[in-house]
A protein has these predicted regions:
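Short alpha-helix in the alpha/beta-hydrolase fold that links the catalytic acid
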Residues: 79-80, 184, 193, 207-216
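Alpha/beta-hydrolase fold nucleophile elbow
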Residues: 124-134
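Active-site nucleophile loop of the alpha/beta-hydrolase fold
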Residues: 95, 153-163, 180-184
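Catalytic histidine neighborhood in serine/cysteine hydrolases
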Residues: 212-234
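An N-terminal hydrophobic leader/cap segment in hydrolases
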Residues: 4-45
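Catalytic histidine-centered segment of alpha/beta-hydrolase-like enzymes
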Residues: 205, 231-241
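Membrane-embedded segments
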Residues: 50-120, 133, 137-138, 144
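Short beta-strand/loop motif that positions the catalytic acidic residue
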Residues: 191-192, 197-203
C-alpha cells in the first residue's frame, strides 16, 4: 500500500513537472505571418528579439494599437481596421515568436514590447486608442494602466489566465506552477479612460463569466459591457456589430 501511494505521488509530481516545464507550449500558439497578407512591416526596438509591427501609417493625432489573440495573424485584421478607422495610423503587434518576430513569447516580453510600441507611436500621435482581443486583452489592459491611452476596447477578455488555467487543470496546483499569470483584474482598477468590454454570447474558450469578472474590477462608470449575440470566441469579429463597437458604440451597461 505504501509503495502504491509512493508511485501515485511520483506520477503526480512528474505530471506537475511536465506542466511546469512545458506550460508556455500550452499557452502560446505562434502562427507565421502569411505571405498572402501583402502588408509591410516595421521592426520594433526590443531586447533580445526582432519584433515586427504591421502598420498603416497616417499623419495626424490619432492612432490605433491592436493586440491580437492567440494563434492570430494580426496582419489579416489590417484591412477591416483601416476601413473602420480611415483617419487613424494603425499598428498591429506581432508578438515574439509570432508572424515573423523572433524570440519566445512570455507575459513580461509581451508587456514590455507593448509599452515600447506605445512610446514610439506616441511621439507622433497624441491620441492613441487600444484594442486587445483574447490573449491581447491582457496586454492591452496592462498598457492602459501605465500609459495615457485615450480609449480601451477589450474583446473576449479574461480576468486572469491563472484562473482559466486552474479551471482547466483542477487537480493540479496551477496557481503555484504558472509563470505567466496575466492577472488583468489587477490592472483594471488603474485604468482611467473610457473602456468597452466585449463578450461573445457563446464563447467556448473564455467563459463570459471571466469577462464579467474583469468588468467588475474597473472603476465605477469607467467601463461598459456588451455581449454580441449569436457569436462564439472565434466568430465574434464576423458580426456586423463588431467594427462599430471597436469604433465607439453607445454604452450598454455602465459600472465597475
Amino acid at each position: 500500500m505504501v509503495t502504491l501511494v509512493a508511485v501515485v505521488a511520483l506520477v503526480y509530481l512528474g505530471l506537475c513537472g511536465v506542466l511546469f516545464l512545458y506550460q508556455r507550449n500550452l499557452i502560446y500558439f505562434p502562427q507565421p505571418r502569411s505571405s498572402g497578407s501583402g502588408a509591410t512591416t516595421l521592426t520594433l526596438p526590443a531586447d533580445g528579439a526582432q519584433v515586427l509591427v504591421t502598420p498603416r501609417q497616417r499623419g495626424g493625432p490619432n492612432a490605433l494599437l491592436y493586440f491580437g489573440g492567440n494563434a492570430e495573424d494580426v496582419s489579416y485584421s489590417l484591412p477591416g481596421l483601416s476601413t473602420a478607422f480611415p483617419d487613424y495610423a494603425i499598428y498591429l503587434l506581432h508578438y515574439r515568436g509570432y508572424g515573423g518576430s523572433s524570440g519566445k513569447p512570455s507575459e513580461a516580453a509581451l508587456f514590455a514590447d507593448a509599452l515600447t510600441l506605445f512610446d514610439q507611436v506616441h511621439a507622433d500621435h497624441q491620441n492613441i486608442e487600444v484594442v486587445g482581443r483574447s490573449l491581447g486583452s491582457g496586454v492591452a489592459v496592462h498598457l492602459a494602466s501605465l500609459r495615457p491611452v485615450t480609449r480601451l476596447v477589450l474583446v473576449t477578455p479574461y480576468d486572469s489566465l491563472q484562473e482559466l488555467a486552474a479551471q482547466q487543470f483542477p487537480y493540479f496546483p496551477v496557481r503555484w506552477l504558472l509563470l505567466d499569470k496575466f492577472e488583468s483584474w489587477r490592472y483594471a482598477e488603474h485604468v482611467v479612460v473610457p473602456t468597452l468590454v466585449v463578450a461573445a454570447e457563446h464563447d467556448e474558450i473564455i467563459p463570459r463569466t471571466s469577462s464579467e469578472a474583469l468588468f467588475k474590477h474597473f472603476r465605477t462608470g469607467a467601463a461598459s459591457f456588451k455581449v454580441v449575440a449569436g457569436t462564439s470566441h472565434n466568430t465574434i469579429s464576423e458580426s456586423p456589430e463588431y467594427m462599430p463597437l471597436l469604433k465607439g458604440a453607445p454604452r450598454e451597461r455602465s459600472g465597475g
